[in-house]
């Protein structure tokens, strides 16, 4: 793993003395496959950070967009931002959308030097699996850490950027475009599987934090004390912090990402024969207390299969 920290001298690894100067930004041609909130964050973020210098095209079969062939032909970096829902039976992740798109994408990227940047949340081993299936294309895993409500601001102000690639040149090329445009982010260069695991670690841990808050809220209710007061004083400890400790009227966690990613992680852990009782308890408790299972109605959060 290599870390590019904006507060350290290694920020000049690529022989550019002032990454913050927009005049030094080398414009790139960027294509986006899938234009939901993740794809829109990529487009809006790079457009703003480059002051409109980057050429950005997107393809989404459900929206008015450029043809896939044109987007890939005219791009150096192809960001794949396709949905990866949970299976309807909650056995794990459904990668069929991205799996079915990859043959068409790689047919146009083979032996071109173009880099396929996977933004979609995929289970550990997926990117290296694509590398084996499509050896003439170049891949990188670059997860998003966005909230749907504030996706553009989250993208623009990301604390860390993870670049997961097996090819050192690919890793450096992707790191460069981020460092030139986003001066405050810390860039971690690692392998794809580690990068994929980081995304699941983050979302599973935050789900756990929400679940624990709700557990403790129930306890406070039973013994007649105010959870808000307990939370305020406990969260004053910087090791705990108050993020994701709010207990809302809906209770638990929902939305598009946390539920599907927890289910995906449980599925992968079962395959690896790793104990999943903690995650299973979290998930069952969350379904019990959550008043509305909103993820069941959100497009592409749950597979129809």
Write out the residue ranges for each language-model feature.
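Rossmann-like NAD(P)(H) cofactor-binding subdomain of soluble oxidoreductases
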Residues: 77, 86-150
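Internal alpha-helical scaffold of NAD(P)-dependent oxidoreductase catalytic cores
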Residues: 14-18, 23-25, 52, 130-140, ...
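C-terminal substrate-binding/catalytic lobe of Rossmann-fold NAD(P)-dependent oxidoreductases
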Residues: 226-280, 291-299, 303
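Conserved NAD(P)H cofactor-binding loop of Rossmann-fold oxidoreductase domains
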Residues: 82-83
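NAD(P)+-binding Rossmann beta1-loop-alpha1 motif at the extreme N-terminus of oxidoreductases
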Residues: 14-73, 77
């Amino acid at each position: 793993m290599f870390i590019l920290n904006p507060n350290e001298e290694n920020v000049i690894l690529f022989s550019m003395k002032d990454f913050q100067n927009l005049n030094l930004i080398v414009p790139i041609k960027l294509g986006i496959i899938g234009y939901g909130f993740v794809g829109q964050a990529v487009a809006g973020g790079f457009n703003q950070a480059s002051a409109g210098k980057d050429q950005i095209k997107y393809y989404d079969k459900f929206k008015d967009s450029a043809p896939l062939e044109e987007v890939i032909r005219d791009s150096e970096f192809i960001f794949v931002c396709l949905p990866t829902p949970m299976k309807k039976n909650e056995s794990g992740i459904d990668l069929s959308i991205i799996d079915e798109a990859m043959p068409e994408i790689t047919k146009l990227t083979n032996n071109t030097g173009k880099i396929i940047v996977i933004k979609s949340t995929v289970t550990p081993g997926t990117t290296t699996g694509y590398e084996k299936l499509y050896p003439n294309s170049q891949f990188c895993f670059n997860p998003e850490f966005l909230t749907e409500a504030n996706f553009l601001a989250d993208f623009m102000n990301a604390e860390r950027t993870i670049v997961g690639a097996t090819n050192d040149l690919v890793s450096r090329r992707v790191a460069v475009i981020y460092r030139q445009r986003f001066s405050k982010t810390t860039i971690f260069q690692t392998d794809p599987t580690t990068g994929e695991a980081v995304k699941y670690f983050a979302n599973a841990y935050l789900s756990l934090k929400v679940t624990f808050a709700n557990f403790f809220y129930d306890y406070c209710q039973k013994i007649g004390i105010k959870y808000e007061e307990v939370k305020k004083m406990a969260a004053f400890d910087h090791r705990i912090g108050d993020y994701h400790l709010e207990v809302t009227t809906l209770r638990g966690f929902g939305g598009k990402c946390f539920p599907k990613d927890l289910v995906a992680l449980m599925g992968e852990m079962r395959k690896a024969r790793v104990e999943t009782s903690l995650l299973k308890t979290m998930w069952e408790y969350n379904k019990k207390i959550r008043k509305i299972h909103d993820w069941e109605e959100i497009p592409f959060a749950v597979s129809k299969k």
